A protein has these predicted regions:
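Short, hydrophobic/aliphatic alpha-helical segments
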Residues: 157-169, 274-278, 304, 330-332
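Hydrophobic/aromatic-lined pockets within catalytic cores
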Residues: 165, 210, 214-217, 221, ...
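Active-site-adjacent "gating/activation" loops or surface patches in catalytic cores
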Residues: 125-137, 245-320, 324-329
Length: 332
């Protein structure tokens, strides 16, 4: 059985690497029609792959030798499978394809946004740099331009959201859940806490963190010399604006390498591998999807970091965050 599991795992790695590469190529350039077609094709394949995967997971979870297998591969793997199995049934295959299509539509729409501001053309990522500038009017103006886009595209965005909510609620009910929240906890493999735990956590945040947050906002307003902190002020903590990293990409990478060299523990060699192998796409550009993520190419044992640098401290924060994911995945 263990040998069969290893063969299955290798097949999953190969399929997973293909799906990861397809998603990466799509998010790198949402205007690339070939990349979009590949993404659509992989979305259509995914439910069938999940169905085959689930059959094997069910067989292993119910296997007579489960206790012996857990000693070999650990019990956590079986806990994750028990969470994943109830989240799929062939009855929702078409719904999953539609869900992926809606996600692609949203990604393409937001990636297409262009903002003319401060004599430059910006996307959703680069317009965000103004939130950390010292000039309050500039901060406010950038936010107005950005949110005007959401207002102009509100009908399409609302339609996508409405369709997605109803689609997911329908999937949950087809699978026997009351709503998508119950399904969502299983899909995210939350095997060590539940809705009740999160509800208690929210209460604690409201009781202890929110009052502290209000105090910090008051102190921030005093630091900035304003009467009240508005939403276009929230990212700034100094009258002079926030400290900015080097604006040259190569200089940023050099400083990152220096930092990891000082830390050691394998981070230095790992980052050099990431740089030399081209396993990073960090600069924002037209047509590129927003946000940041880390994914893994399991067949070659290397992760990939996707981000959108915009010239603020957030570049450093997002990058080091994703590097943590990447290094953990690489070492494990």
């Amino acid at each position: 059985v263990l040998n069969s599991m290893k063969q299955w795992d290798q097949q999953r790695r190969e399929v997973g690497t293909y799906l990861a590469l397809v998603y990466l190529r799509f998010t790198q350039n949402t205007t690339d029609e070939q990349a979009k077609a590949e993404k659509d094709q992989s979305d259509k394949m995914r439910p069938k792959l999940t169905e085959l995967d689930n059959r094997i997971k069910k067989a292993l979870v119910q296997h007579a030798c489960r206790s012996e297998l857990e000693q070999q591969v650990g019990s956590q793997m079986f806990s994750l499978w028990e969470s994943e199995i109830p989240t799929f049934d062939p009855a929702i295959a078409d719904d999953l394809i539609e869900e992926s299509g809606l996600e692609s539509q949203y990604t393409t729409l937001t990636a297409s946004a262009e903002f003319e501001f401060d004599n430059e053309t910006h996307n959703h990522s680069t317009i965000g740099k103004y939130r950390e500038y010292a000039d309050r009017d500039l901060r406010h103006g950038a936010e107005q331009v950005k949110w005007q886009w959401f207002n102009e595209n509100g009908e399409e965005l609302d339609d996508l959201y409405h369709t997605m909510v109803n689609l997911r609620h329908g999937m949950a009910q087809k699978l026997g859940f009351n709503n998508y929240v119950e399904l969502g906890y299983l899909k995210m493999c939350r095997v060590d806490y539940n809705q009740a735990d999160v509800a208690r956590y929210r209460q604690m945040v409201q009781q202890h963190v929110t009052p502290l947050g209000n105090i910090i906002r008051q102190q921030q307003a005093e630091q900035l010399g304003i009467d009240k902190t508005m939403y276009w002020d929230e990212a700034v903590y100094h009258k002079e604006g926030n400290p900015l990293p080097p604006q040259e990409y190569d200089a940023m990478i050099k400083l990152a390498q220096d930092m990891f060299d000082q830390q050691g523990y394998g981070l230095d060699e790992f980052f050099q591998l990431m740089t030399d192998g081209g396993y990073m796409d960090l600069q924002s550009r037209k047509g590129k999807a927003g946000g940041g993520y880390c994914m893994s190419f399991d067949t070659i044992g290397m992760p990939f970091i996707f981000a959108n640098f915009k010239g603020t401290r957030a570049d450093v924060e997002v990058f080091t965050h994703e590097m943590g994911h990447a290094f953990q995945g690489y070492m494990s």
